[in-house]
């Protein structure tokens, strides 16, 4: 659609202008582009971004499915989704002691693998499924996020010069909510495409 295309082009132009202005500010820049020359920092930021896309991007649609399709009350929906939150808290608490015995890179890889496995389990969910089918996916998404996300900020800050630690922390923090927003958008586009293919136009 024309309006979507122009909005995208306008956003891309604004982003390009922002990066150009930041590059001109040098050490006074809000976003130090030089940080992206550090491979480990880039990897930590991208993992933060991807982790939030796949761990949290589905949550709004799961909420809509539980409430709109299965007609669960807000309280019951919240209790079901609490499984992911509690698992994430427990996994995050365990990830600290584990990092003393296992390489952080191994923990990050294991966490992302668990998230991927959880997403794979989502293929078992149908319109007729009940919440027990959803539970393994929520537990795995929570466990994977809990293992990875606590270490990514430390990793991003530890590999940059000390004077740029604040900028590195701010940049990495920016990619957390950005990943969630992009994840919601991506899964929303996917849902819309599936609905347009599966339902007749009058139903839409």
What are these regions (language model features)?
Residues 21-27:
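Membrane-interface capping segments at transmembrane-helix boundaries
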Residues 202-204:
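Transmembrane-helix exit segments and adjacent C-terminal regions of multi-pass membrane proteins
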Residues 16-19:
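Alpha-helical transmembrane segments
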Residues 2-10, 14, 28-199:
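12-transmembrane solute porter fold
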């Amino acid at each position: 659609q024309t309006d979507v295309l122009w909005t995208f082009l306008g956003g891309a132009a604004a982003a390009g202008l922002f990066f150009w202005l930041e590059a001109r500010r040098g050490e006074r820049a809000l976003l130090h582009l030089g940080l992206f020359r550090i491979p480990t920092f880039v990897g930590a930021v991208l993992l933060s971004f991807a982790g939030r896309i796949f761990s949290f991007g589905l949550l709004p649609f799961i909420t809509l499915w539980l409430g709109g399709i299965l007609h669960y009350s807000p309280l019951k929906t919240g209790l079901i989704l609490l499984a992911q939150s509690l698992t994430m808290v427990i996994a995050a608490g365990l990830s600290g002691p584990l990092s003393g015995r296992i390489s952080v890179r191994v923990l990050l890889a294991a966490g992302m693998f668990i998230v991927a496995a959880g997403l794979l389990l989502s293929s078992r969910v149908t319109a007729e499924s009940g919440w027990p089918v959803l539970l393994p996916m929520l537990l795995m998404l929570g466990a994977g996020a809990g293992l990875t996300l606590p270490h990514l900020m430390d990793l991003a800050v530890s590999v940059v010069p000390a004077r740029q630690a604040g900028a590195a922390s701010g940049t990495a923090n920016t990619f957390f909510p950005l990943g969630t927003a992009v994840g919601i958008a991506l899964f929303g586009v996917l849902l819309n495409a599936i609905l347009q293919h599966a339902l007749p136009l009058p139903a839409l």
